Amino acid sequence: MDSQRNLLVIALLFVSFMIWQAWEQDKNPQPQTQQTTQTTTTAAGSAADQGVPASGQGKMITVKTDVLDLTINTHGGDVEQALLPAYPKELGSNEPFQLLETTPQFIYQAQSGLTGRDGPDNPANGPRPLYNVEKDAFVLADGQNELQVPMTYTDAAGNTFTQTFVFKRGDYAVNVNYSVQNTGEKPLEVSTFGQLKQSVNLPPHRDTGSSNFALHTFRGAAYSTPDEKYEKYKFDTIADNENLNVSSKGGWVAMLQQYFATAWIPRNDGTNNFYTANLGNGIVAIGYKAQPVLVQPGQTSAMTSTLWVGPEIQDKMAAVAPHLDLTVDYGWLWFISQPLFKLLKWIHSFVGNWGFSIIIITFIVRGIMYPLTKAQYTSMAKMRMLQPKIQAMRERLGDDKQRQSQEMMALYKAEKVNPLGGCFPLIIQMPIFLALYYMLMGSIELRHAPFALWIHDLSAQDPYYILPILMGVTMFFIQKMSPTTVTDPMQQKIMTFMPVIFTVFFLWFPSGLVLYYIVSNLVTIIQQQLIYRGLEKRGLHSREKKKS
């Protein structure tokens, strides 16, 4: 085993990872949008059972804060559109990113209200409530820290239901407060609900391109309970009518995509039912229904829930609800990616540039892993020193493979050499590299984040492919500076083309990730020379043995 064979191992692991990414994405193809309404069988407690009908035609009111631009339908009080002014749709664009949308091509809404036996959103009680509002447009004025949008509905019996959206400056968490005033002679039984519904198939204008071979981020539903901190639920699964039905005190339900999320967080001490449902016409939903509340005659009861609608900013999400920050898609290595991101963010607080922060964290990570790297190179050097003895043994034993294997193991034992010693450090390092990959791909902070010169977006590919080419050049230098005992012509050809193959792979990778690999390769070159000098003093390395 030597450095160049090590590159081959890295390549095989890398290609295996890419194949796994593609398989993970394609093993459950998305269902085609249905042209006719389906009759679905849903789990107990699903949207169909709980009475969450579709929105009707009401008046559209607009709400603008410093970070949100929402459109709310007074028929039901659903949030039908959500724009995020602080996040442009594309780099250099003045058009804000649209998270929630209601168009003939695509549906993504945040629904809420009061269902239950006497709730106005229960279909058994008629159409959804048509709320009254005092004006059509609400704006958070300069110097104002809170904006309230009250919507009131009075039923035929004279009972008053008020739904108030509460916005705060700089906040993507919207509190939804409910007030139920019972003017009758019998108790009212009501339950709050919150539901997110979305079209399964993305239209062209919503496709971010995150489905290419270089990147696979999760788009779907998720939920959290005290027993299950974070569980994903694929849209495909919901579309196949394999629905969620769990009861929980606390927790949340959400819909996720790269960089952005929506979530309903019930705020009560009772038990909530979390559910999913296939609503037909290619639309799926995830939601919650709270435990019923009895409002006695002449009394007024208050209930509340919270809607998160915005970017996946981890510290802010964690402050809104436990484990809501886990919605950032760091994959199965999240337990490594999260502390790495916290370190990256801490570095950024000093240097103020995410690109330079990536460079610094690369030096830190590679410095921490230096003992493993040194052990890897030492093991490979010992293996090279044994090559003449191994070759002589093979010539002496001829085709007797069994004796070759026995004597080779005896030689390794006598020389105190582990033949897999060069692989183990690499295998240990790979999860860290993959965790960095997920961290750089899933963090909203790197979206449209500039570095220097021509790199204006670390989350996008290099428009001129300069960074991938530089990465390939650094791989070439590592290869040329590494001693080798490879004599097989096929392996030599593979080694020769390895930098080219990696360069092609990285052409479509985000600039931040390519920058990490360039710096990591430069650190490898430096560490390689330091290690070789130490090995020379021990007689385990000779510069004359290097082959160009």
Curated annotation (Swiss-Prot):
Q: Where in the cell is it found?
A: Cell inner membrane
Where is it mainly found? membrane
Which residue positions does the secretion signal occupy?
Answer: none
Entry membrane topology: Multi-pass membrane protein
Annotated keywords: Cell inner membrane, Cell membrane, Chaperone, Membrane, Protein transport, Transmembrane, Transmembrane helix, Transport
Entry keyword Membrane: yes
Region Disordered: what ranges?
28-56
Compositionally biased region (Low complexity): 29-42
Coiled-coil annotated spans:
none
TM annotation in the entry: 6-26, 350-370, 424-444, 458-478, 499-519
Q: Which GO terms describe its cellular component?
A: plasma membrane
A Gene Ontology annotation in the biological process aspect, one of them, is: protein transport
Q: What is a GO molecular function of this protein?
A: membrane insertase activity
What is its biological role? Answer: Required for the insertion and/or proper folding and/or complex formation of integral membrane proteins into the membrane. Involved in integration of membrane proteins that insert both dependently and independently of the Sec translocase complex, as well as at least some lipoproteins. Aids folding of multispanning membrane proteins.
PANTHER family, per the entry: CYTOCHROME C OXIDASE ASSEMBLY PROTEIN COX18, MITOCHONDRIAL (PTHR12428:SF65), OXA1 (PTHR12428)
Q: How does it assemble?
A: Interacts with the Sec translocase complex via SecD. Specifically interacts with transmembrane segments of nascent integral membrane proteins during membrane integration.
Q: Which HAMAP family match?
A: YidC_type1
Output this protein's name.
Membrane protein insertase YidC
Q: Which organism does this sequence originate in?
A: Salmonella choleraesuis (strain SC-B67)
